Design a protein with these regions (language model features):
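Conserved nucleotide-sugar phosphate-binding/catalytic loop shared by glycosyltransferases and other
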Residues: 4-14, 30, 34-86
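Donor-nucleotide binding loops and adjacent catalytic segments primarily
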Residues: 46, 50-54, 178-181, 185, ...
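Short amphipathic alpha-helix
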Residues: 17-28
């Protein structure tokens, strides 16, 4: 094992977790090109394809989310898979010897940061949403720092651990050279009208879009443009 910076990043399940995780990894590599980064995800989930495509190594755990209702007998299997994942990721952490573990939410980050914290590895949580996820709320007591994008997150996390950093953004989005005029032309907008952008993150985007479609006629009567 080399003496270079080693970081484990864990989480996924949806793009809302995966892309911030990859952005964090890219930022670390930009600052410390020699850094070694290992991702830990959930077997069969989106991260197992997306992370290697971004150029990083990932290992998968047999972890799954709880099934509703919570008293479903199927959750016995979920609990057993979680215990199996804890054993596996404990060995992963011991072998990789990271200086820190970062959790971005999702099934795998619960087991990974649980194991890392028990082994004395400093843990950091990155919460992308204004309403904290179940996994991150569970991990809050174990985390050294909790990075958030919104105010009033003391509702979910210890105030002394919170750092308002904003959400990680992919560099290609920051590097865009598109002008306002080009954007107006691309979307076919009237520059004299007000414009509303409706955007949802990850799997929640479908619900948002369907809600807007049901109210589209009402919105159009307000003489605004919609993207």
């Amino acid at each position: 094992m080399s003496d270079s910076l080693r970081i484990i990043i864990s989480g996924g399940g949806t793009g809302g977790h995966i892309f911030p995780a990859v952005s964090i990894a890219n930022a670390i590599k930009a600052l410390r090109p020699e850094a070694e980064i290992l991702f830990v995800g959930a077997q069969g989930r989106m991260e197992m394809q997306r992370v290697p495509a971004a150029g990083y190594e990932i290992v998968g755990l047999p972890v799954r989310g709880l099934i509703r209702p919570l008293w479903s007998p199927k959750n016995i299997g979920v609990a057993l898979d979680y215990l199996k994942s804890l054993r596996q990721v404990r060995k992963i952490v011991k072998d990789f010897k990271p200086q820190a573990a970062v959790g971005v939410g999702g099934y795998a980050s619960g087991a990974t940061l649980d194991a890392a914290a028990r082994l004395g590895i400093p843990c950091l949580i990155q919460e992308q949403n204004s309403y904290a996820g179940v996994t991150n709320k569970h991990l809050a007591k174990k985390a050294s720092k909790i990075c958030v994008a919104y105010d009033e997150m003391e509702r979910f996390f210890p105030a002394d651990k919170i750092m308002k950093t904003g959400n990680p953004v992919r560099q290609n989005l920051l590097d865009t050279k598109l002008t306002r005029e080009e954007a107006i032309k691309t979307f076919g907008l009237d520059p004299t009208k007000k414009t509303i952008l409706f955007v949802g993150g990850s799997l929640g985007a479908r619900t948002i879009n369907e809600s807007i479609l049901r109210r589209l006629d009402t919105i159009r009567k307000s003489d605004v443009q919609i993207i």
